[in-house]
Amino acid sequence: MAEQHNEPKKLGFAQLAALIVGSMIGGGAFNLPSDMARGAGTGAVIIGWIITGIGMIALAFVYQSLANRKPELTGGVYSYAKAGFGEYIGFNSAWGYWLSAWIGNVSYSVLLFGAVGYFLPMFGAGNNVASIIGASVLLWAFTLLILNGVSGAALINLITTIAKLVPIFLFIVISLFMFNFDKFTFQFWGTSDLGGIVTQVKSTMLVTLWCFIGIEGAVVVSGRAKKQSDVGKATVLGLIGTLIIYMLITLMALGVMDRVKLSGLENPSMAYVLEFAVGKWGAVLINLGLIISLFGSLLGWALLAAEIPYVAAKDGVLPKVFAKLNKKGTPSGSLIITNLLVQAFLILTLVASSTYQALYSVASTAILVPYLLSAMYGFKLALTGETYDKNPTGRTRDKIFGGIATVYAIWLCYAAGLKYLLLCFILYAVGIIFFYIGKKQNNKDAEVFVGKEKILAIIVLVIAIIAIVMLFNGTITI
């Protein structure tokens, strides 16, 4: 008798928006004051946010347009890359996104118990034995929660998103009352040791680069949305809301403490800014907010990390085990494999933290590939006119947003650095094995690489080999 699956509950607008905001506003938001001040003056910080805002809003509108014009593509970044550029490129989009998601959850676990260590010193900086035990218990508790149904997990993510915004809003309001315009304008364009304006702006871009990972959250789970029209709206409104919050955190802090003091604060710097303004309770409040924030981010990214390989496996480009569903309609195979890898890397942080940090940087770079491919696909549709024959409204707008988003995504790849891009190819080369298995399981007689895909796979392998050689001869280091 066939296994029965209950129809999974669908996600509404509020849950989709919370998934986006909850995924983007993680631990990094609480350290923005010092991270931004460390390499730039106030003027360069403002320019950096303007550039980031333009690029990310363009990308958000690309996702909105794709969700509206291609509602049948319910696999998000994977589906867009596959539809635009073929199966193998689509697979690489899914592979890079998945790597980034689960290795990112390792980082969130360490940061979470580091924040708990502020109140309970036994957890230290988040990477000792007590922390790893705590993180492991939390990891598998989340796994059981998600296995019980995606909708219930999304509801908890909505609650934690609202809860973590409270201390952030309090920080902004208190900072507004403590704001000193003279501090804000002092050395407005930075000092000579920071370099020129272009150098300063670039330093802020390297920070903001990581702030918006999660913008694609709604399109990744679009197959579980009640209404496809909610996907685009949640993406754009979630992005704009998050951008405003980030800008206010950064600029208000520059009006409470001068840039030099801000740049020297420990993590989470927002806590020490508020402690400077109102006393010890300010730091306690922000650290509690950080714990809630990371708790929500862990849950949100656990959802996203399981969804993409599930969709790819259903399409036959990943092994079938990733496509297994439980009775609740949750991708149990993908979820368990993903969290087993998270568990392994949590243990790795005990014995080889530097290796873990390098792999995390590589995996974070890998997520830029799905962003670039999504932007290029949106731009391609607008240029060719596909889907615009019956509804030409907004084609010029979509060309503009698609072009801006594509240029911005290329810039982000450049900002990530050649070293991590090269190392990234090693991970993509490993992915070829999984792609081969998935294709053969789906159809043992099918050709694995079609047309130019063979050339692309060879290029990936060659660059990966070059990167490995450069690692061994010391040209690049981990």
Swiss-Prot record:
It is found in: Cell membrane. Keywords: Amino-acid transport, Antiport, Cell membrane, Membrane, Transmembrane, Transmembrane helix, Transport. It comes from the Bacteria. This is Arginine/ornithine antiporter. The chain crosses the membrane at residues 11-31, 43-63, 83-103, 106-126, 130-150, 159-179, 203-223, 236-256, 284-304, 333-353, 359-379, 417-437, 456-476. It is a multi-pass membrane protein. One of its GO terms (molecular function) is arginine:ornithine antiporter activity. Catalyzes electroneutral exchange between L-arginine and L-ornithine.
